[in-house]
């Protein structure tokens, strides 16, 4: 497992109608990146903040799925929240303490204006290589895709570690590895498959099973 993490979970909120949002738990991955399943709730809500009832339903299903496969609950969970985590930390702390589970919460922000250049190659207008990152305290800008020189600067991901015991270096490494194992393409993805699949589930919400854990990747 990556850094003794047992389970990775992706969360996203999609808009199906004006003002109507559906949260989804993209994926329950084990610590080696193998898919356990995904869960799409049918609970509609207003705004980007996931309702606590929906959160509890999602995480209950994830824990059951993990235990069904591994015969025990995960000891350490990492949550990747697409965009901003508007839910606040308190609910997560109470929920996972109640279940005796360590957790880390990481925001994966993809729509940012920042661009990166390799400091030793600026004069040649060269782009940084895939896997390079700039780290500032609990934040990191990560280049997760390979872009050819002179074709425009790649858009990094902004990773924000909101809670937990992992180092930001460990989080960067995990996100990069999870961006390399997308089974739906021969190319690597810009996003880790946690939030990549969550985003796809939201966009195809009408075509995936609701309120039941599934491992059928219809949305790919």
What feature does the model see in each segment?
Residues 1-220:
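Long, contiguous domain-sized segments
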